């Protein structure tokens, strides 16, 4: 499977075309819109989320609630477009109109794509860069992830994301009873944190950063349960499941690090403290005593829960901006200010959940794939049976 996205932050709409989704999958627009609504929530979000009410429209690939096997086209309209029709319109304008155009940007923000993108593509108005590099694009990535989650749900695979840390405040209590329990509690938290006490401190940290015109980042975790053994490959580097998951998480705006299981802690431990001992269970077959490697060995799933974490840096748009340079005058200036969040970590956990779900679904369809969802399910069940009987 694959998908492409198109659209600018303040353009008329965002679009994604999804190819390779098997036929016969039951899906409704409400399933997608539920995920889009989750992305818009979260303490620390900016005024843009008060303007947008993201709703996906399915234009192709689905008939009477079931996928056809043909490409699925989804669009999400930008409500804010009506305020940007002249600035972001596709029609040509004169040089005089361009010189008088408001909202042109010549002072790049440190930490953003502004300057590098302007040099790469030759844009004197860096709005041409920031409109596409904006995290607004993740709206349709979440929509694509919603389709992937429906595939996984049909196969008995569950995906849940939550927040572990914001602005140095760490969740102390993360021992959830089940993945359903984790989902229920985090959906009720304004910062998507399972630990309610830590969640309140996270909100306080966000409020303090906002008051100071600053921003803060954090750490999110995504858990995948119900995986069959052997998804991925040890044969080639580009087919390793952990490689694909790491790339997906790092492709999210502002994400700068990724780890699996105990992650970077493994560097300071002995091998006996890192690797998961193999045991035989009458019901499950081969399994592990622990899950320190996060459900992945040799580029493949072990059948244990996959645990992946991503580090999100603070958003680079600051209301007390850092020093920059005006590219027209070469004089020092404060960086440009755009409407932005003070913290997007809670929303980013939903995006991380979506991209992980996509990579898992893609790997499963590739490995067990046929063109019909029920046949894929039969093959997945055969692998689960093999794990029990091998």
UniProtKB/Swiss-Prot annotation:
Descriptive protein name: Chorismate synthase
Catalyzed reactions: 5-O-(1-carboxyvinyl)-3-phosphoshikimate = chorismate + phosphate
GO biological process per UniProt: amino acid biosynthetic process; aromatic amino acid family biosynthetic process; chorismate biosynthetic process
EC number(s) stated in the UniProt entry for this protein: 4.2.3.5
UniProt-listed InterPro entries: Chorismate_synth, Chorismate_synth_AroC_sf, Chorismate_synthase_CS
Cofactor: FMNH2
Family annotation (PANTHER family): CHORISMATE SYNTHASE
MF-aspect GO terms: chorismate synthase activity; FMN binding
GO cellular component, one term: cytosol
Keyword NADP: yes
The protein's role, per its UniProt record: This reaction introduces a second double bond into the aromatic ring system.
Transmembrane segments: none
UniProt binding sites for FMN: 132-134, 253-254, 298, 313-317, 339
Cofactor binding summary note: Reduced FMN (FMNH(2)).
Residues binding NADP(+), per UniProt: 39, 45
The keyword Acyltransferase appears for this protein: no
Record keywords: Amino-acid biosynthesis, Aromatic amino acid biosynthesis, FAD, Flavoprotein, FMN, Lyase, NADP
A Pfam match: Chorismate_synt
Pathway given in the UniProt record: Metabolic intermediate biosynthesis; chorismate biosynthesis; chorismate from D-erythrose 4-phosphate and phosphoenolpyruvate: step 7/7
Superkingdom of the organism of origin: Bacteria
